Design a protein with these regions (language model features):
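A short SAM/SAH-binding and catalytic strip from SAM-dependent methyltransferases
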Residues: 112-128
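Conserved beta-strand signature within the Rossmann-like core of class I S-adenosyl-L-methionine
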Residues: 140-152
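Class I SAM-dependent methyltransferase Rossmann-like catalytic core
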Residues: 1-36
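Conserved SAM/SAH-binding beta-strand->alpha-helix loop
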Residues: 73-75
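A short glycine-rich, Lys/Arg-flanked "PGG" loop and its adjoining helix->strand segment in the class I
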Residues: 129-142
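Class I S-adenosyl-L-methionine
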Residues: 158-160, 165-224
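Conserved SAM-binding loop of SAM-dependent methyltransferases across substrates and taxa
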Residues: 48-63
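Conserved SAM-binding loop
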Residues: 80-81
Length: 224
């Protein structure tokens, strides 16, 4: 899968643009709710970081934010770093060209006040969701927030979302906001995709990151 080209679709595709707007709104609310002082942000499978970068650029808490973005694709990382420079965010952002499933990618950054897990849940199988939620517990600070997305009309999305919500509740997360929206054609002209964008608050205490074993396994390499 050419993820660099896939992300370019955000510039032309109305459905992706609308989803991005929702994600930015959820992130902005998390920043608004954050206590005074430093706001630590982690993004898992960050892409080019356009959800975080533009939100921070325009937000009143910009100076407080310290974001740690993890992305494996070097082209997307290069684009993200260039965007950081253009938005004068280099002092706020660490853009890491690393494997998001490797716990070593988050050393020194976790636990964070805001954890972004957007665009990656459709790449993991249902049986892998408990590991994803454990990763959330390791990455998120007490009273922090996790922002996540899931496409619902694809790969048993509704079933996955309900399973995720149940697992998160059992792990100490409470749902703060959920947006479920149906858009026009995404990449296929034969069906109308729908998306969930959720924010959960973590009321528990963060668990330790594993020493070396993968946080979770990505089983799919395409979104269509």
């Amino acid at each position: 899968m050419d993820w660099h080209n896939w992300h370019n679709a955000y510039d032309q595709n109305p459905a992706l643009k609308k989803r991005l707007v929702l994600v930015r709104k959820h992130l902005s609310r998390c920043l608004d709710r954050s206590a005074p002082g430093e706001i630590r942000i982690i993004s898992v499978c960050a892409g080019d970081g356009r959800d975080i970068l533009r939100t921070l650029a325009d937000h009143k808490r910009r100076a407080d934010a310290r974001a740690h973005l993890v992305e494996l694709d070097p082209k997307l990382v290069a684009d993200g770093r260039n965007a950081c420079a253009a938005l004068e965010l280099l002092s706020n952002i660490d853009f890491m060209n690393e494997d998001a499933t490797d716990p070593r990618s988050y050393r020194g950054a976790a636990p964070a006040n805001v954890v972004m897990m957007c665009g990656m849940l459709g790449l993991v199988d249902l049986a892998e969701l408990p590991n994803v939620v454990r990763a959330m517990q390791a990455l998120c600070a007490h009273n922090g927030h996790v922002v996540w997305t899931r496409r619902l009309d694809w790969r048993n999305g509704v079933q996955h979302m309900k399973a995720l919500q149940k697992l998160m509740l059992q792990a100490g997360f409470t749902q703060a906001t959920l947006s479920v929206t149906s858009f026009g054609a995404l990449l296929s002209k034969t069906r109308k995709p729908s998306f969930a964008v959720g924010t959960h608050r973590f009321g528990g205490e963060p668990i330790a990151l594993p020493e070396s074993e993968r946080l979770f396994t990505i089983s799919h390499q395409s979104i269509e």
